[in-house]
Amino acid sequence: MFSLTNLFNIFALLYVLRGVQLLVIIVRQWSSLRAEPLTAAKKQLAEQASFFIAVPIAVFFHELGHALAVWAFGGQVVGFVYRFFWGEVEHMGAYTPAERWFVALAGTLGSLLFGLAIWWLLRRSQSSTLRFFGLRAFRFQIYFSLLYYPLFSAVLPIGDWRVIYDFSATPLLSGVTLVVHLLFLVFYWQYDRQGWFEEPSHETAVAQAEFDALERETAAQPQNTDLQLHYIDILRRGSAHNKAETALKRFLRDNPNSALAYLELAALEAGKQRTVSKKAAAYAEKALQSGLSEPRRVAMANQMAASYQLEMGQGATAVQTYTQAIAALNNLEPTLADQHALANLYRSRSLAHRRQQQYDAASQDLQQATTLAKQLGDDNLVAAYQEDWAILQNHANHASKAVSYNSPDQ
Protein backbone atom coordinates (compact mmCIF):
# COMPACT_ATOMS: atom_id res chain seq x y z
CA MET A 1 0.00 0.00 0.00
CA PHE A 2 1.30 3.42 -0.96
CA SER A 3 1.90 5.50 2.16
CA LEU A 4 2.99 9.00 3.12
CA THR A 5 6.43 7.58 3.88
CA ASN A 6 6.71 6.26 0.31
CA LEU A 7 5.84 9.71 -1.02
CA PHE A 8 8.47 11.35 1.20
CA ASN A 9 11.06 8.84 -0.01
CA ILE A 10 10.28 9.56 -3.67
CA PHE A 11 10.67 13.31 -3.14
CA ALA A 12 13.85 12.74 -1.15
CA LEU A 13 15.31 10.63 -3.96
CA LEU A 14 14.55 13.31 -6.56
CA TYR A 15 16.06 16.01 -4.34
CA VAL A 16 19.15 13.90 -3.67
CA LEU A 17 19.72 13.45 -7.41
CA ARG A 18 19.61 17.21 -7.88
CA GLY A 19 21.90 17.68 -4.89
CA VAL A 20 24.46 15.30 -6.40
CA GLN A 21 24.30 17.21 -9.70
CA LEU A 22 24.99 20.45 -7.85
CA LEU A 23 27.87 18.90 -5.91
CA VAL A 24 29.49 17.76 -9.17
CA ILE A 25 29.15 21.27 -10.61
CA ILE A 26 30.56 22.86 -7.45
CA VAL A 27 33.53 20.48 -7.27
CA ARG A 28 34.39 21.03 -10.93
CA GLN A 29 34.07 24.81 -10.68
CA TRP A 30 35.32 25.24 -7.11
CA SER A 31 38.19 27.60 -7.91
CA SER A 32 36.12 29.86 -10.15
CA LEU A 33 33.15 29.80 -7.76
CA ARG A 34 35.31 30.99 -4.87
CA ALA A 35 36.92 33.70 -6.98
CA GLU A 36 35.38 37.14 -7.34
CA PRO A 37 32.95 38.44 -8.43
CA LEU A 38 29.61 37.25 -7.12
CA THR A 39 27.82 36.91 -10.46
CA ALA A 40 24.11 36.32 -11.04
CA ALA A 41 24.92 32.71 -12.02
CA LYS A 42 26.85 32.14 -8.78
CA LYS A 43 23.98 33.60 -6.77
CA GLN A 44 21.57 31.20 -8.44
CA LEU A 45 23.87 28.26 -7.72
CA ALA A 46 24.30 29.32 -4.07
CA GLU A 47 20.53 29.65 -3.74
CA GLN A 48 20.02 26.11 -5.00
CA ALA A 49 22.84 24.80 -2.80
CA SER A 50 21.17 26.35 0.26
CA PHE A 51 18.31 23.92 -0.32
CA PHE A 52 19.59 20.83 -2.10
CA ILE A 53 22.91 20.60 -0.22
CA ALA A 54 22.41 22.43 3.08
CA VAL A 55 18.98 20.97 3.89
CA PRO A 56 20.14 17.31 4.06
CA ILE A 57 22.82 18.36 6.55
CA ALA A 58 20.27 20.39 8.51
CA VAL A 59 17.92 17.39 8.61
CA PHE A 60 20.70 15.33 10.20
CA PHE A 61 21.25 17.95 12.91
CA HIS A 62 17.49 18.22 13.36
CA GLU A 63 17.23 14.50 14.12
CA LEU A 64 20.42 14.62 16.19
CA GLY A 65 18.81 17.35 18.30
CA HIS A 66 15.90 15.02 19.04
CA ALA A 67 18.27 12.17 19.90
CA LEU A 68 20.39 14.29 22.25
CA ALA A 69 17.28 15.48 24.09
CA VAL A 70 16.05 11.89 24.44
CA TRP A 71 19.37 10.82 25.95
CA ALA A 72 19.46 13.88 28.22
CA PHE A 73 16.14 12.85 29.78
CA GLY A 74 17.14 9.22 30.20
CA GLY A 75 15.26 7.93 27.18
CA GLN A 76 16.43 5.34 24.68
CA VAL A 77 16.80 5.91 20.94
CA VAL A 78 15.52 2.73 19.26
CA GLY A 79 15.59 4.02 15.68
CA PHE A 80 17.33 6.82 13.80
CA VAL A 81 15.76 7.24 10.33
CA TYR A 82 17.64 9.57 7.99
CA ARG A 83 16.45 10.09 4.41
CA PHE A 84 18.41 13.28 3.57
CA PHE A 85 15.30 15.46 3.24
CA TRP A 86 13.28 13.95 6.05
CA GLY A 87 13.98 11.88 9.12
CA GLU A 88 12.60 10.42 12.30
CA VAL A 89 13.90 9.46 15.74
CA GLU A 90 12.12 6.52 17.35
CA HIS A 91 12.57 6.50 21.10
CA MET A 92 11.29 5.14 24.38
CA GLY A 93 11.23 6.71 27.81
CA ALA A 94 9.17 7.90 30.74
CA TYR A 95 8.98 11.64 30.08
CA THR A 96 7.18 14.42 31.85
CA PRO A 97 5.01 16.63 29.59
CA ALA A 98 7.72 19.31 29.72
CA GLU A 99 10.37 16.80 28.66
CA ARG A 100 8.20 15.60 25.75
CA TRP A 101 7.82 19.25 24.72
CA PHE A 102 11.59 19.81 24.76
CA VAL A 103 12.35 16.60 22.86
CA ALA A 104 10.02 17.84 20.10
CA LEU A 105 11.50 21.36 20.17
CA ALA A 106 15.11 20.12 20.11
CA GLY A 107 14.90 19.19 16.43
CA THR A 108 13.98 22.73 15.41
CA LEU A 109 16.74 24.10 17.64
CA GLY A 110 19.20 21.78 15.88
CA SER A 111 18.15 23.06 12.43
CA LEU A 112 18.32 26.70 13.49
CA LEU A 113 21.71 26.30 15.17
CA PHE A 114 23.04 24.62 12.03
CA GLY A 115 21.85 27.54 9.87
CA LEU A 116 23.30 30.05 12.32
CA ALA A 117 26.62 28.16 12.38
CA ILE A 118 26.92 28.21 8.57
CA TRP A 119 26.33 31.95 8.48
CA TRP A 120 28.70 32.55 11.42
CA LEU A 121 31.51 30.47 9.91
CA LEU A 122 31.22 31.95 6.41
CA ARG A 123 30.37 35.57 7.24
CA ARG A 124 34.03 36.66 7.03
CA SER A 125 35.07 34.38 4.18
CA GLN A 126 37.20 36.04 1.51
CA SER A 127 34.83 34.59 -1.08
CA SER A 128 31.66 36.63 -1.59
CA THR A 129 30.01 33.52 -3.05
CA LEU A 130 30.56 31.57 0.18
CA ARG A 131 29.36 34.54 2.26
CA PHE A 132 26.21 34.70 0.15
CA PHE A 133 25.67 30.94 0.49
CA GLY A 134 25.93 31.31 4.26
CA LEU A 135 23.32 34.06 4.27
CA ARG A 136 20.88 32.15 2.08
CA ALA A 137 21.35 28.86 3.95
CA PHE A 138 20.64 30.64 7.26
CA ARG A 139 17.58 32.33 5.75
CA PHE A 140 16.24 29.06 4.43
CA GLN A 141 16.67 27.29 7.77
CA ILE A 142 14.70 30.05 9.51
CA TYR A 143 11.98 29.81 6.88
CA PHE A 144 11.89 26.01 6.95
CA SER A 145 12.03 25.66 10.74
CA LEU A 146 9.71 28.47 11.81
CA LEU A 147 7.25 28.77 8.94
CA TYR A 148 7.15 25.79 6.58
CA TYR A 149 7.48 23.01 9.17
CA PRO A 150 4.85 24.42 11.58
CA LEU A 151 2.41 24.76 8.66
CA PHE A 152 3.31 21.23 7.57
CA SER A 153 2.51 19.95 11.09
CA ALA A 154 -0.79 21.83 11.08
CA VAL A 155 -1.92 20.27 7.79
CA LEU A 156 -0.69 16.68 8.30
CA PRO A 157 -1.29 14.49 11.37
CA ILE A 158 2.45 14.28 12.08
CA GLY A 159 5.23 16.66 13.03
CA ASP A 160 7.04 18.07 16.04
CA TRP A 161 4.90 21.18 16.26
CA ARG A 162 1.83 19.14 17.21
CA VAL A 163 3.70 18.26 20.42
CA ILE A 164 5.26 21.71 20.85
CA TYR A 165 1.81 23.32 20.64
CA ASP A 166 -0.06 20.74 22.69
CA PHE A 167 -1.64 23.32 25.00
CA SER A 168 -3.56 20.66 26.92
CA ALA A 169 -0.28 19.04 28.04
CA THR A 170 2.03 22.07 28.36
CA PRO A 171 -0.09 25.25 28.44
CA LEU A 172 2.63 27.51 29.83
CA LEU A 173 5.51 26.22 27.70
CA SER A 174 3.36 26.15 24.55
CA GLY A 175 2.12 29.67 25.26
CA VAL A 176 5.64 31.03 25.77
CA THR A 177 6.76 29.21 22.62
CA LEU A 178 3.95 30.82 20.64
CA VAL A 179 4.97 34.31 21.75
CA VAL A 180 8.67 33.72 21.01
CA HIS A 181 7.79 32.01 17.71
CA LEU A 182 5.71 34.98 16.56
CA LEU A 183 8.41 37.44 17.61
CA PHE A 184 11.01 35.51 15.62
CA LEU A 185 8.73 35.50 12.56
CA VAL A 186 8.19 39.26 12.85
CA PHE A 187 11.94 39.89 13.10
CA TYR A 188 12.59 37.49 10.22
CA TRP A 189 9.98 39.25 8.05
CA GLN A 190 11.43 42.68 8.86
CA TYR A 191 15.05 41.71 8.23
CA ASP A 192 14.13 39.85 5.05
CA ARG A 193 12.17 42.85 3.75
CA GLN A 194 15.12 45.10 4.56
CA GLY A 195 17.41 42.92 2.44
CA TRP A 196 19.58 41.57 5.24
CA PHE A 197 19.88 38.23 3.41
CA GLU A 198 20.73 39.80 0.03
CA GLU A 199 23.87 40.77 -1.85
CA PRO A 200 24.07 42.36 -5.33
CA SER A 201 25.61 40.50 -8.24
CA HIS A 202 28.44 41.98 -10.34
CA GLU A 203 29.73 41.22 -13.81
CA THR A 204 33.44 41.72 -13.06
CA ALA A 205 35.79 41.62 -10.09
CA VAL A 206 36.63 45.27 -10.75
CA ALA A 207 32.96 46.22 -10.54
CA GLN A 208 32.62 44.36 -7.25
CA ALA A 209 35.70 46.05 -5.80
CA GLU A 210 34.32 49.43 -6.86
CA PHE A 211 31.01 48.60 -5.19
CA ASP A 212 32.76 47.62 -1.96
CA ALA A 213 34.58 50.96 -1.99
CA LEU A 214 31.33 52.76 -2.78
CA GLU A 215 29.60 51.03 0.12
CA ARG A 216 32.26 52.33 2.51
CA GLU A 217 32.00 55.83 1.03
CA THR A 218 28.22 55.96 1.33
CA ALA A 219 28.45 54.90 4.98
CA ALA A 220 30.99 57.66 5.61
CA GLN A 221 29.07 60.30 3.61
CA PRO A 222 25.34 59.74 4.24
CA GLN A 223 24.49 63.26 3.03
CA ASN A 224 26.11 62.80 -0.39
CA THR A 225 23.01 62.23 -2.53
CA ASP A 226 24.92 61.30 -5.68
CA LEU A 227 26.83 58.57 -3.85
CA GLN A 228 23.67 57.27 -2.19
CA LEU A 229 21.76 57.06 -5.48
CA HIS A 230 24.67 55.41 -7.25
CA TYR A 231 24.86 52.83 -4.46
CA ILE A 232 21.11 52.18 -4.69
CA ASP A 233 21.29 51.84 -8.47
CA ILE A 234 23.96 49.13 -8.21
CA LEU A 235 21.92 47.28 -5.59
CA ARG A 236 18.91 47.32 -7.91
CA ARG A 237 20.85 46.24 -10.98
CA GLY A 238 22.43 43.45 -8.94
CA SER A 239 18.96 42.14 -7.92
CA ALA A 240 19.32 43.04 -4.24
CA HIS A 241 15.78 44.39 -4.50
CA ASN A 242 14.79 44.53 -0.85
CA LYS A 243 18.07 46.14 0.16
CA ALA A 244 17.69 48.71 -2.63
CA GLU A 245 14.10 49.47 -1.64
CA THR A 246 15.05 49.95 2.00
CA ALA A 247 17.83 52.36 1.05
CA LEU A 248 15.52 54.20 -1.35
CA LYS A 249 12.79 54.73 1.21
CA ARG A 250 15.36 56.01 3.69
CA PHE A 251 16.75 58.32 1.00
CA LEU A 252 13.28 59.66 0.12
CA ARG A 253 12.56 60.49 3.75
CA ASP A 254 15.47 62.93 3.58
CA ASN A 255 14.97 63.92 -0.08
CA PRO A 256 11.22 63.74 -0.77
CA ASN A 257 11.42 65.62 -4.08
CA SER A 258 14.25 63.66 -5.69
CA ALA A 259 13.31 62.84 -9.28
CA LEU A 260 16.13 60.31 -9.56
CA ALA A 261 14.95 58.46 -6.46
CA TYR A 262 11.45 58.09 -7.91
CA LEU A 263 12.94 56.82 -11.17
CA GLU A 264 14.91 54.24 -9.19
CA LEU A 265 11.70 53.21 -7.42
CA ALA A 266 9.97 52.84 -10.78
CA ALA A 267 12.79 50.68 -12.15
CA LEU A 268 12.85 48.64 -8.94
CA GLU A 269 9.12 47.93 -9.08
CA ALA A 270 9.32 47.01 -12.77
CA GLY A 271 12.26 44.69 -12.09
CA LYS A 272 10.50 42.87 -9.26
CA GLN A 273 7.32 42.29 -11.26
CA ARG A 274 9.07 41.61 -14.60
CA THR A 275 6.58 44.07 -16.07
CA VAL A 276 5.57 47.69 -15.58
CA SER A 277 2.93 47.70 -12.87
CA LYS A 278 0.60 50.53 -11.96
CA LYS A 279 2.88 51.43 -9.06
CA ALA A 280 5.98 51.46 -11.30
CA ALA A 281 4.24 53.70 -13.83
CA ALA A 282 3.13 56.07 -11.06
CA TYR A 283 6.71 56.35 -9.79
CA ALA A 284 7.95 57.02 -13.34
CA GLU A 285 5.39 59.80 -13.77
CA LYS A 286 6.32 61.19 -10.35
CA ALA A 287 9.97 61.29 -11.47
CA LEU A 288 9.02 63.29 -14.57
CA GLN A 289 6.84 65.65 -12.52
CA SER A 290 9.69 66.16 -10.05
CA GLY A 291 11.93 67.65 -12.73
CA LEU A 292 13.79 64.74 -14.28
CA SER A 293 16.02 66.30 -16.91
CA GLU A 294 18.83 63.99 -18.10
CA PRO A 295 17.66 62.77 -21.56
CA ARG A 296 18.33 59.07 -21.07
CA ARG A 297 16.52 59.06 -17.75
CA VAL A 298 13.65 61.04 -19.25
CA ALA A 299 13.41 58.43 -22.00
CA MET A 300 13.48 55.62 -19.44
CA ALA A 301 10.70 57.15 -17.34
CA ASN A 302 8.51 57.84 -20.37
CA GLN A 303 9.07 54.33 -21.69
CA MET A 304 7.89 52.77 -18.42
CA ALA A 305 4.84 55.03 -18.26
CA ALA A 306 3.99 54.30 -21.90
CA SER A 307 4.33 50.54 -21.41
CA TYR A 308 1.75 50.63 -18.64
CA GLN A 309 -0.55 52.89 -20.68
CA LEU A 310 -0.37 50.49 -23.61
CA GLU A 311 -1.09 47.53 -21.33
CA MET A 312 -4.16 49.35 -20.00
CA GLY A 313 -5.49 49.96 -23.53
CA GLN A 314 -4.62 53.67 -23.56
CA GLY A 315 -3.14 53.53 -27.05
CA ALA A 316 -3.30 57.22 -27.95
CA THR A 317 -1.73 58.29 -24.66
CA ALA A 318 0.95 55.63 -25.04
CA VAL A 319 1.86 56.96 -28.51
CA GLN A 320 2.35 60.45 -27.07
CA THR A 321 4.46 59.17 -24.19
CA TYR A 322 6.62 56.99 -26.46
CA THR A 323 7.09 60.05 -28.69
CA GLN A 324 8.47 62.00 -25.73
CA ALA A 325 10.89 59.16 -24.95
CA ILE A 326 12.08 59.04 -28.57
CA ALA A 327 12.51 62.81 -28.67
CA ALA A 328 14.68 62.71 -25.54
CA LEU A 329 17.10 60.20 -27.09
CA ASN A 330 17.11 61.88 -30.50
CA ASN A 331 18.62 64.98 -28.88
CA LEU A 332 21.76 63.01 -27.94
CA GLU A 333 24.86 61.91 -29.76
CA PRO A 334 23.74 58.28 -29.73
CA THR A 335 25.78 55.46 -28.23
CA LEU A 336 25.18 51.80 -29.08
CA ALA A 337 22.98 51.51 -26.00
CA ASP A 338 20.98 54.54 -27.13
CA GLN A 339 20.44 53.00 -30.57
CA HIS A 340 19.21 49.78 -29.00
CA ALA A 341 16.86 51.79 -26.80
CA LEU A 342 15.63 53.82 -29.79
CA ALA A 343 14.97 50.70 -31.82
CA ASN A 344 12.93 49.28 -28.95
CA LEU A 345 11.02 52.54 -28.55
CA TYR A 346 10.14 52.70 -32.25
CA ARG A 347 9.02 49.08 -32.12
CA SER A 348 6.88 49.79 -29.03
CA ARG A 349 5.31 52.89 -30.59
CA SER A 350 4.60 50.81 -33.71
CA LEU A 351 2.69 48.38 -31.51
CA ALA A 352 0.72 51.25 -29.96
CA HIS A 353 -0.20 52.50 -33.46
CA ARG A 354 -1.13 48.99 -34.58
CA ARG A 355 -3.51 48.50 -31.68
CA GLN A 356 -5.30 51.64 -32.79
CA GLN A 357 -5.38 50.33 -36.38
CA GLN A 358 -3.06 53.16 -37.50
CA TYR A 359 -1.18 50.92 -39.89
CA ASP A 360 0.66 53.64 -41.84
CA ALA A 361 2.21 55.05 -38.67
CA ALA A 362 2.90 51.55 -37.36
CA SER A 363 4.70 50.67 -40.59
CA GLN A 364 6.86 53.80 -40.46
CA ASP A 365 7.94 53.14 -36.86
CA LEU A 366 8.71 49.50 -37.55
CA GLN A 367 10.77 50.60 -40.56
CA GLN A 368 12.79 52.89 -38.26
CA ALA A 369 13.28 50.11 -35.72
CA THR A 370 14.42 47.64 -38.40
CA THR A 371 16.85 50.13 -39.90
CA LEU A 372 18.44 50.76 -36.50
CA ALA A 373 18.69 47.03 -35.80
CA LYS A 374 20.49 46.49 -39.11
CA GLN A 375 22.89 49.36 -38.37
CA LEU A 376 23.68 47.69 -35.07
CA GLY A 377 24.25 44.38 -36.81
CA ASP A 378 21.87 42.68 -34.39
CA ASP A 379 20.49 39.72 -36.33
CA ASN A 380 18.29 38.56 -33.47
CA LEU A 381 16.66 41.97 -33.26
CA VAL A 382 16.16 42.09 -37.03
CA ALA A 383 14.54 38.64 -36.93
CA ALA A 384 12.20 39.74 -34.13
CA TYR A 385 11.17 42.80 -36.12
CA GLN A 386 10.54 40.65 -39.19
CA GLU A 387 8.03 38.74 -37.10
CA ASP A 388 6.42 42.06 -36.20
CA TRP A 389 6.20 42.89 -39.91
CA ALA A 390 4.33 39.63 -40.52
CA ILE A 391 1.87 40.42 -37.72
CA LEU A 392 1.39 43.96 -39.01
CA GLN A 393 0.76 42.61 -42.52
CA ASN A 394 -1.82 40.20 -41.15
CA HIS A 395 -3.65 42.88 -39.15
CA ALA A 396 -3.63 45.30 -42.06
CA ASN A 397 -4.97 42.67 -44.46
CA HIS A 398 -7.81 41.88 -42.12
CA ALA A 399 -8.63 45.58 -41.80
CA SER A 400 -8.52 46.26 -45.52
CA LYS A 401 -7.81 43.76 -48.29
CA ALA A 402 -6.66 46.63 -50.48
CA VAL A 403 -3.80 47.67 -48.18
CA SER A 404 -0.50 45.81 -47.95
CA TYR A 405 2.52 46.59 -45.79
CA ASN A 406 5.71 44.88 -46.80
CA SER A 407 8.84 44.50 -44.73
CA PRO A 408 11.99 46.20 -46.04
CA ASP A 409 13.34 42.85 -47.31
CA GLN A 410 10.30 42.18 -49.51
What is each residue range found by the language model?
Residues 214-221, 249-254, 287-298, 328-339, ...:
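Flexible helix-coil transition and linker loops at the boundaries of alpha-helical arrays
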Residues 238, 272-274, 312, 356, ...:
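Structural motif corresponding to the intra-repeat A-B loop/turn of tetratricopeptide repeats
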Residues 210, 244, 279-280, 318, ...:
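Single-residue signature of alpha-solenoid repeat helices
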Residues 1-230, 237, 242, 273, ...:
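Hydrophobic transmembrane alpha-helices and their immediate loop junctions
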